[in-house]
């Protein structure tokens, strides 16, 4: 058995659009979106432990280890293996946290997915991609997307994923220095909850500026730095927010144009140039 698996990438995502089409009786919102993998990422390192413990060996500001999706994902996989009669060792997990928390780019969910992928391989537990996705939904609505490992048209509460091809694109992503709690946005009375449903064909015919983010107006009103970043980025591109915020982004026709925009971003914001990915960098470790 291998003893370690290092430099495991957990990529971010952008919501190219995000429509709220309704709300279920249980309070969950019905969504439509295209989730786009991008090459911004966290990096995780896994080492086996002989004592059977799951340990996060690096500190993450504001996130106790017991509440971290990384630890929860590892323990869930260990429990699932035990239920199948498979005894596995423990693991020490170190993370290089590069993605902002509360940014709407899926950092925590992606970290959890990479943990499931890496430990399923390292432990030899043998779960297939669909089985890992079933575990993932117990950790968070976005986790199954990162386990799917491809860009997708997303519907329902996030559980209906249709893989799709998206064009190669350069983006500038800005984090305006605030963390936006998702429940704050979804519980706002003024949130639009009745956007007309669309199809993959609708999206494909009207790239790149299809649709909107129904959460954007609520987040911009509640968190002025989000509004400021959107206003600034709108001067150089088609700015929109990803997820429930706080990150905003714009697409550019070339890397040169993205570089030019990035150079002018005010220094008090974190900003990145990034490009699309066609597949999750860890996808080769997934069993179909």
Regions found by a protein language model. Give the residues of each.
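Glycine/serine-rich anion-binding loops at beta->alpha junctions
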Residues: 94-123, 141, 238-252
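Conserved, helical-rich catalytic subdomain that frames metal- and/or nucleotide-binding sites
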Residues: 148, 153-238, 253-288
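ATP-binding N-lobe of GHMP and related small-molecule kinases
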Residues: 1-102, 121, 125-130, 175-176
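Contiguous, small/hydrophobic- and glycine-enriched helical/loop subdomains that border
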Residues: 112, 116-153
């Amino acid at each position: 058995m291998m003893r370690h698996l290092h430099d495991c990438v957990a990529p971010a995502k952008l919501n190219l659009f995000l429509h709220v089409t309704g709300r279920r009786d249980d309070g969950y919102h019905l969504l439509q979106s295209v989730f786009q993998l991008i090459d911004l990422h966290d990096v995780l390192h896994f080492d086996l432990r002989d004592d059977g413990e799951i340990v996060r060996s690096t500190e993450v500001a504001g996130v106790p280890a017991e509440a971290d999706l990384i630890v929860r994902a590892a323990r869930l996989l260990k429990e699932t293996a035990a239920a199948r009669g498979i005894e596995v060792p423990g693991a020490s997990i170190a993370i290089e946290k590069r993605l902002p928390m509360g940014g709407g780019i899926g950092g925590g969910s992606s970290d959890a997915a990479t943990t499931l992928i890496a430990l399923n391989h390292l432990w030899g537990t043998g779960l297939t991609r669909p089985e890992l996705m079933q575990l993932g939904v117990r950790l968070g609505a976005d986790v199954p997307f990162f386990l799917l490992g491809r860009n997708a048209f997303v519907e329902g509460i996030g559980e209906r994923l249709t893989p799709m091809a998206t064009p190669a694109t350069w983006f500038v992503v800005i984090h305006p220095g605030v963390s936006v709690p998702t429940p704050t946005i979804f519980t706002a009375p003024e949130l639009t909850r009745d956007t007309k449903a669309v199809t993959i064909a609708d999206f494909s015919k009207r790239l790149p500026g299809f649709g909107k983010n129904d959460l954007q107006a609520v987040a911009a009103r509640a968190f002025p730095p989000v509004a400021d970043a959107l206003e600034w980025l709108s001067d150089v591109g088609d700015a929109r927010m990803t997820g429930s915020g706080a990150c905003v982004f714009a697409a550019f026709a070339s890397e040169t144009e993205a570089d030019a925009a990035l150079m002018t971003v005010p220094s008090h914001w974190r900003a990145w140039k990034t490009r699309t990915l066609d597949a999750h960098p860890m996808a080769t470790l997934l069993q179909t």
